[in-house]
Structure formats: C-alpha cells, structure tokens
C-alpha cells in the first residue's frame, strides 16, 4: 500500500513539474525558437536527413535530436508543449535510468525513489529538462551509456558482457548523432578512473571493440546518407563545431576554468546542503566499487568541460544523474546518524526564498529602482514571483519541522517556480526574448507580408515557427546562418544594410515588406538608416517597420 502511495505521489510530482505548466511558458529565443523551427521544417518538408533552418542548410548539430523534437510536434502539434515534449520525455527517461541504476547498486526501493525525485527537482535538471534544447537528449544517451557499461562489467557471462558493450556502442552512436563526438569522449573519461582502480582493463580490451562496432553501425546509415547529400557536412561539423567551439583560442562561449563552480552550486538547489557531504562521503567510501563509479562519473566530465575553452551550463547536465544518487544515499545516512546537513539544507532553502522575496521587492514598481523590472500594470506578475520564493522558503521551513522525516519535502521547494514562472516573466523581457509575444501583438500586420526581414536569427526562427513559413530573410546580420547562406541556392536570403534601399525598390511592388528589428530600449527609431516607412510599430525591444506597394 505504501508503494502505491509513493507511485501516486511520484506521478503527481511529475505532472505538476513536467506536464501541466509547460504550455504556459512562451518559447525563448534563440534556442527554443531555433529547434522548434528546425523540427517544424523537417515535418513540413519530409527531409529527415539534412537539417534546415529557415530553408537553409544548418550543420551545427547532427540529426537525432531533431528527429525526437519532430516526433514531439507531430504527436502534440506545433505548440509550446509539442516543442518541449521531446526534452521532457528524455529527462523522464533519464530519471527512470537513475531509478534502475540505484536499484541495481543497492536494491533499495526507497533510495531509488529518493534519487529519482532529487534528480528531477534539481534546479539545473528542471531548467534544462523543460527547455527545448538538445542537451537533455545527449544527457540521456550518456547516462544510458554509463548504465550499459556498468551492466557489461558486472555481467558474469560472455553473453552478458557482449550485450552490455553492444548496448554501450548504440548509446554512444545515438549520442554522436545527437550532439557529436563528445558522446565518445565523455563516457571514456568517466569510466577510466573506475577501470584503473578496479583493475578491469582486461574486460575493457576484450569486449570494447563490440562497442566500437555497434557505435559505427548505429551512425553509419545516416552518416553515409548525409555525406552523399551534403559532402561538406562532416568537415564543417568536425572542425568548426568541435575543434573551434571547444579547443581553439577563438572558441565559442569562452569562460574561465572555475566557470562551472557557481553552476554546480546553483544547479544543486534545493539540495545544495547535501552537496559537500555527498561528495566527501563518496570519497571516504572510495573502496566501494559503485561509489567510485558514481564519483568518477560526476567529477571527470566536470573536469573535462572545465579545461575546455568553450563552456555552457548545459554541457554538464549528465553529471547530475550520479550526483543525485550520491546525494540520496548520503541523505538517508544523515537522517539516521547526523541530520546536520539536512538542517543546513533547509536553512539554505529558507535563505534562498527570503532573498528572492527581498530581491523581487527591490526590482518591483514599489522598490527603490528608477527602472523597475516590472511595471505598475504588471503587479500580478510581482505577486507570482513573490509566491515562487515564498513557497521555496515555506518548504525549506517545513523540512526543519521534523528533519529526519520531512527532509525529502525539499523537492517541493521549486513547485512555485514550476507552476508560476510562466506568469511572472516581465513584459520587457517577453518583448525581446519571446517572439510569440511580438507575433501576437502584430499578427494582423505580419500575416499578409510578402517578405519579412529581420536582423536576429532567434527572432527569425520565432517568426517562422509562429507564422508557419520558412522564407524569412536575414537583414544586416547572418549570425549562425552564415555557413548556410554561402551556398549558391541561398542567394537572395540575405540583404545587407547598404543594399536594402535598392532591394526595397526592386521588390516593393510585389507586396507588403516587413522589417522586424531588434533595438536597444532607449534607441531612437528615427535614427535608423532605413528608407521612410509606411508603418512603424514599436514593442519595446522589437520594432515592426512596414513598406506597402506604391
């Protein structure tokens, strides 16, 4: 009976966090609008081999993540939930692997359930796991690969070991097809300390080739298909998207070595109080094979991405699966022996909630700021933000009432965030980061446009997805579409600032021409170097400029 109650509670938890509130949040640009539009175009064109964005070749990532996103929009429609359905599914599958792996290690159902709940409620997991990017997919394949490797190394028969390594190769292959060759490097680095300490080199060398074969066979059909269709894909993807992004001096998203320290700290909320103890207990218990495996799985990718020049918070998502297991194991021991860490965790959550309440007041219309984040007419959004932090502090307090039994309720600290964040985003943010909001405000003007030009790829993708058209033209800036725009058949999909006046004269009689520009909040529109327009409609950071036939 208790197991049934736990399962009902888990399903209610998943529904409140990962299902019910998702449609209330508009898509963010540039990431969510980009991936939404790529998958929409894949469904519209029926081309499941070559990814396209705005009708242009888009070689930044391989294909598998787009497949999953496309299936999400196919099943649930071109809406906010449909766009995010794939990442939510991947996150829940990863949580299922956390459950299975914990049961495999300790045969303890309560520990497995707690590890799962901790994983799903970690701030970084929730933030990325409900955000339409490819990282939840690669995290799933990496976690599946680590589970497969453990399964292979614990098998007692050659059939079991062979099956485990074959499965490892398939997961690595799908990882390569999702985000590239990092799906090969990360698992290898993660298992090496464990293999070395356990002296399991023999099994690795005897059966490892099976993983290589199954990985190659997994990637080969699509790899050959895209090489035939687009011969330069692999050169661009390997050199630009791997070497330049991570290793060279001009790498994308450059950040210092310590970049991930605050990411791990913030990402560990609402379980931050367990982080030091979980890592220390894992190190102290390093003679235990499973603990070494979890510790290595957590630390090695973190070090690898810290050394790389290019860094983003999403890169280390897979590290939090083993960390959640370590946290759950440590928390149960602390509840029995010394609940100090659990009390500290409760106080951290109270402090975070109270700090958020104060910060919300400071940036509200009633605070001391001359330019508040929310305007007076958005008072309901301020109260939503207050509710988010109040619930966080309340559940932090509740865990302290009987800490040995109530500490798991820290998982409910982000409940307000999950349910209300979509209602608390300030209009000034929505106007710049949510193209759907802009489209809703300007739908009547945009819909009849013969040509639409914009200077932002993220906005262009948002316009394309919302209006169900892929012929948006880039104006002045090419951004990440630079490579695709270099192809001969992409001629006419970019107009520079100097060419715009002539281009306008040539095309004006064909129909309404709409220019959507991103501007600074205090920028004077009249100072823009563009021909006089028939219509100007400013929505804070985005402005619609329209030219009608003469």
UniProtKB/Swiss-Prot annotation:
<keyword id="KW-0448">Lipopolysaccharide biosynthesis</keyword>
<dbReference type="GO" id="GO:0103015">
    <property type="term" value="F:4-amino-4-deoxy-L-arabinose transferase activity"/>
</dbReference>
<keyword id="KW-0808">Transferase</keyword>
<comment type="function">
    <text>Catalyzes the transfer of the L-Ara4N moiety of the glycolipid undecaprenyl phosphate-alpha-L-Ara4N to lipid A. The modified arabinose is attached to lipid A and is required for resistance to polymyxin and cationic antimicrobial peptides.</text>
</comment>
<keyword id="KW-0441">Lipid A biosynthesis</keyword>
<keyword id="KW-1133">Transmembrane helix</keyword>
<dbReference type="InterPro" id="IPR050297">
    <property type="entry name" value="LipidA_mod_glycosyltrf_83"/>
</dbReference>
<comment type="pathway">
    <text>Lipopolysaccharide metabolism; 4-amino-4-deoxy-beta-L-arabinose-lipid A biosynthesis.</text>
</comment>
<feature type="transmembrane region" description="Helical">
    <location>
        <begin position="7"/>
        <end position="27"/>
    </location>
</feature>
<keyword id="KW-0997">Cell inner membrane</keyword>
<feature type="transmembrane region" description="Helical">
    <location>
        <begin position="288"/>
        <end position="308"/>
    </location>
</feature>
<dbReference type="GO" id="GO:0010041">
    <property type="term" value="P:response to iron(III) ion"/>
</dbReference>
<protein>
    <recommendedName>
        <fullName>Undecaprenyl phosphate-alpha-4-amino-4-deoxy-L-arabinose arabinosyl transferase</fullName>
        <ecNumber>2.4.2.43</ecNumber>
    </recommendedName>
</protein>
<feature type="transmembrane region" description="Helical">
    <location>
        <begin position="165"/>
        <end position="185"/>
    </location>
</feature>
<dbReference type="InterPro" id="IPR022839">
    <property type="entry name" value="ArnT_tfrase"/>
</dbReference>
<feature type="transmembrane region" description="Helical">
    <location>
        <begin position="111"/>
        <end position="133"/>
    </location>
</feature>
<feature type="transmembrane region" description="Helical">
    <location>
        <begin position="346"/>
        <end position="366"/>
    </location>
</feature>
<dbReference type="GO" id="GO:0009245">
    <property type="term" value="P:lipid A biosynthetic process"/>
</dbReference>
<feature type="transmembrane region" description="Helical">
    <location>
        <begin position="315"/>
        <end position="335"/>
    </location>
</feature>
<dbReference type="InterPro" id="IPR003342">
    <property type="entry name" value="Glyco_trans_39/83"/>
</dbReference>
<keyword id="KW-1003">Cell membrane</keyword>
<dbReference type="Pfam" id="PF02366">
    <property type="entry name" value="PMT"/>
</dbReference>
<keyword id="KW-0328">Glycosyltransferase</keyword>
<feature type="transmembrane region" description="Helical">
    <location>
        <begin position="263"/>
        <end position="283"/>
    </location>
</feature>
<keyword id="KW-0472">Membrane</keyword>
<feature type="transmembrane region" description="Helical">
    <location>
        <begin position="406"/>
        <end position="426"/>
    </location>
</feature>
<feature type="transmembrane region" description="Helical">
    <location>
        <begin position="137"/>
        <end position="154"/>
    </location>
</feature>
<dbReference type="GO" id="GO:0009103">
    <property type="term" value="P:lipopolysaccharide biosynthetic process"/>
</dbReference>
<feature type="transmembrane region" description="Helical">
    <location>
        <begin position="81"/>
        <end position="101"/>
    </location>
</feature>
<dbReference type="GO" id="GO:0006493">
    <property type="term" value="P:protein O-linked glycosylation"/>
</dbReference>
<keyword id="KW-0812">Transmembrane</keyword>
<feature type="transmembrane region" description="Helical">
    <location>
        <begin position="382"/>
        <end position="402"/>
    </location>
</feature>
<dbReference type="GO" id="GO:0005886">
    <property type="term" value="C:plasma membrane"/>
</dbReference>
<keyword id="KW-0444">Lipid biosynthesis</keyword>
<comment type="similarity">
    <text>Belongs to the glycosyltransferase 83 family.</text>
</comment>
<dbReference type="GO" id="GO:0000030">
    <property type="term" value="F:mannosyltransferase activity"/>
</dbReference>
<feature type="transmembrane region" description="Helical">
    <location>
        <begin position="204"/>
        <end position="224"/>
    </location>
</feature>
<keyword id="KW-0443">Lipid metabolism</keyword>
């Amino acid at each position: 009976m208790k197991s049934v109650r736990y399962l009902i509670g888990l399903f209610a938890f998943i529904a409140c966090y990962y299902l019910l509130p998702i449609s209330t949040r508009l898509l963010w640009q540039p990431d969510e609008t980009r991936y939404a539009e790529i998958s929409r175009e894949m469904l519209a064109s029926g081309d499941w081999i070559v990814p396209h964005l705005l009708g242009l070749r888009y070689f930044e990532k391989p294909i598998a993540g787009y497949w999953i996103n496309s299936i999400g929009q196919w099943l649930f429609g071109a809406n906010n939930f449909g766009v995010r359905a794939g990442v939510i599914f991947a996150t829940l599958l990863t949580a299922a692997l956390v459950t299975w792996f914990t049961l495999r290690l300790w045969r303890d159902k309560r520990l497995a359930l707690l590890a799962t709940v901790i994983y799903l409620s970690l701030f970084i997991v929730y933030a990325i796991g409900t955000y339409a990017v490819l990282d939840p997919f690669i995290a799933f394949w990496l976690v599946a690969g680590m589970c497969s490797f453990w399964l292979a190394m614990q098998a007692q028969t050659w059939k079991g070991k062979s099956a485990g390594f074959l499965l490892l190769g398939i997961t690595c292959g799908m990882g390569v097809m999702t985000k590239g060759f990092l799906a090969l490097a990360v698992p290898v680095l993660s298992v090496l300390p464990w293999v070395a300490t356990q002296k399991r080199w023999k099994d690795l060398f005897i059966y490892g080739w099976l993983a290589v074969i199954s990985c190659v066979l997994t990637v080969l059909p699509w790899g050959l298909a895209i090489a035939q269709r687009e011969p330069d894909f692999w050169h661009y993807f390997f050199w630009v998207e791997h070497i330049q992004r991570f290793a060279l001096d001009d790498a994308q998203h450059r950040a210092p070595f310590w970049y991930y320290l605050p990411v791990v700290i913030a990402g560990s909320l609402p379980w931050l109080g367990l982080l030091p103890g979980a890592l220390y207990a894992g190190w102290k218990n390093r003679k235990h094979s499973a603990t070494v495996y979890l510790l290595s799985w957590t630390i090695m990718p973190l070090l690898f991405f810290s050394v790389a020049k290019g860094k983003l918070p999403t890169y280390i998502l897979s590290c939090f699966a083993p960390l959640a297991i370590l946290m759950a194991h440590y928390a149960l021991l602390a509840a029995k022996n010394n609940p100090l860490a659990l009390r500290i965790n409760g106080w951290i959550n109270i402090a975070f909630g109270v700090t958020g309440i104060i910060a919300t007041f400071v940036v509200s219309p009633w605070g001391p700021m001359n330019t508040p984040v929310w305007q007076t007419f958005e008072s309901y959004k301020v109260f939503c933000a207050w509710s988010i932090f109040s619930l966080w502090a309340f559940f932090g307090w509740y865990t302290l009432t009987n800490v040995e039994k109530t500490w798991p309720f820290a998982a409910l600290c982000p409940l307000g965030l999950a349910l209300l964040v979509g209602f608390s985003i300030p209009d000034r943010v929505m106007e710049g980061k949510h193209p759907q909001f802009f489209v809703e405000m300007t739908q009547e003007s945009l819909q009849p446009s013969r040509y639409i030009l914009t200077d932002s790829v993220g906005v262009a993708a948002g316009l394309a997805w919302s209006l169900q058209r892929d012929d948006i033209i880039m104006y002045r800036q090419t951004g990440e579409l630079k490579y695709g725009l270099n192809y001969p058949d992409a001629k006419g999909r970019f107009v520079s600032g100097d060419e715009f006046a002539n281009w306008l004269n040539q095309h004006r009689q064909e129909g309404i021409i709409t220019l959507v520009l991103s501007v600074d909040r205090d920028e004077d529109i009249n100072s823009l170097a563009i021909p006089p327009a028939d219509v100007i409609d400013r929505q804070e950071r985005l402005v619609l400029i329209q030219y009608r036939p003469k």
